[in-house]
């Protein structure tokens, strides 16, 4: 979701489905891991503009997406505070009908090493993922896609 408002405004009326990733809420983490300035604020503005243009995700009778926003969020190890703030913002600013894909497939690779980023040098735990899903429901989000999870969710 690190898109400029100018670019998004040029696409108004041309795009049917937006699928932005919202990675981090905390400015320090976004600078550390993404190395981009103002990521959280830019992402919030971009996602609000996408939502203004196409609204909530709508499907046809066969379950095929037709139009709307589907927000993706990758749960990261030791970053549940970010996950909670992002989910709270989605529910509050966009509404509980927003379709959210809460992803668990983070895998440390590449530049993520024990020395450089030890705090994210592991997969997320089942408990971290379950807390993310539970919090999404707690703030009123109900259109959740978490079908790829390999463990049973206890509700």
Language model segments and positions:
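Conserved AdoMet/S-adenosylmethionine-binding subsite of the radical SAM
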Residues: 1-114
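Residues lining hydrophobic/aromatic ligand-binding pockets adjacent to catalytic sites
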Residues: 116-119
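Generic hydrophobic secondary-structure packing signal
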Residues: 39-42, 128, 132
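Flexible loop/N-cap segments at domain edges
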Residues: 122, 127
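A cross-taxonomic marker for long C-terminal extensions/tails that follow the last structured domain
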Residues: 130-155
